[in-house]
UniProtKB/Swiss-Prot annotation:
Protein name: Serpentine receptor class gamma-6
GO molecular function list: transmembrane signaling receptor activity
Similarity field: Belongs to the nematode receptor-like protein srg family.
Keywords, comma-separated and alphabetical: Membrane, Transmembrane, Transmembrane helix
Cellular component, GO, one term: membrane
Record lineage: Eukaryota, Metazoa, Ecdysozoa, Nematoda, Chromadorea
Gene that this polypeptide is encoded by: srg-6
Organism: Caenorhabditis elegans
């Protein structure tokens, strides 16, 4: 089928077993990622909080990014993927949601909120890394004395500039594959959430790219940075590279939707791109950071030869 959407009801064209296999294939990586991110947040902010105090601005912003990923994965594992790939519950649960629309009224805007919040978090962390390397320590501390609060406020409130039209608009159920997903009917026609989300993504890409170019140039010329400082910057450069590649894929796929060249394949690719946004950053961080990896997996020597504390 070229287009899997329907407004009439649950589709009978999709085999239950095959749809359930699609779900299981995704849960294989979604659930371990959910557990990994949960443990990373616990280690950074609770169990070994003191180890991350020296670079607390970076780690606070990164924890917010992890928390947004965690919430995205929670929604995907326990709600969105189930409604999409479990045809057995399609009729009963879609009927329940239509009879109790408050759940969609809350969860659908939150889905966009979490994704936009990650874009703002990415920009904030990239800017923090640039200023850390560009400015003198006293200037850096003076700027981030209030800059951290400003970034936290932006991460919390900027997403509302995207989701406001969803909040005031009527939501409905649109049937995909053997299940369904929520959608909305614009109350303000000129404000397309997807188009503005694409704009925010491009702004996030520009800030991330510029910040990392400046950071890379400084590290290339400077020999004064400590080994630990350079390590954290290399890790964030790798995370930013992954982010930019995923963002390019996101922009390309959404441009295809604007051209009405939409298909089941594009729909699934968009899902996998969002999975990449949520999962690859913590995987890169845990892979490149030996000390954090030891602490998360409760290995011996987690506090020895610490590589995450930066002067």
């Amino acid at each position: 089928m070229a287009n899997s959407t329907s407004f009439l009801g649950c589709s009978r064209f999709y085999a239950t077993f095959e749809e359930n296999l699609k779900l299981m294939g995704q849960l294989v990586y979604l659930i371990p990622s959910f557990i990994l991110i949960s443990k990373m947040i616990y280690v950074i902010q609770v169990k070994h909080r003191g180890d991350y105090h020296e670079q607390r601005r970076f780690w606070l912003l990164y924890t917010m990014d992890l928390a947004l990923s965690l919430l995205n994965l929670f929604f995907d594992i326990f709600y969105y993927r189930l409604t999409l790939f479990v045809p057995q519950i399609c009729e009963s649960f879609s009927f329940f949601l239509r009879a109790n629309p408050l759940l969609i009224d809350i969860t659908y805007p939150l889905w966009f909120y979490f994704h936009v919040g990650k874009m703002v978090a990415q920009m904030s962390i990239s800017f923090e890394r640039m200023t850390f390397n560009l400015l003198k320590p006293n200037d850096y501390r003076r700027i981030w004395k209030h800059g951290l609060t400003a970034c936290v406020i932006m991460i919390i409130f900027v997403p509302f500039s995207i989701i406001w039209n969803i909040l005031i608009s009527d939501k409905y159920i649109q049937f995909y594959f053997g299940g369904f997903q929520p959608n909305y009917s614009r109350r303000v026609n000129w404000f397309g959430t997807t188009a503005w989300q694409l704009t925010y993504m491009q702004i996030s890409m520009a800030v991330t790219l510029l910040s990392n170019i400046v950071t890379g140039a400084i590290l290339w010329k400077s020999q004064n940075q400590s080994r630990k400082s350079r390590l954290l910057c290399r890790i964030w450069f790798a995370i930013s590279t992954e982010y930019l590649l995923s963002a390019c894929a996101f922009c390309y796929l959404h441009m295809k939707t604007f051209a009405f060249d939409y298909s089941n394949l594009i729909f699934m690719l968009v899902i996998f791109v969002w999975d990449g946004f949520n999962i690859l950053s913590p995987v890169i961080m845990i892979s490149m950071n030996k000390s954090l990896r030891k602490q998360v997996f409760a290995m011996s020597g987690g506090s020895e030869d610490l590589e995450i504390s930066v002067a």
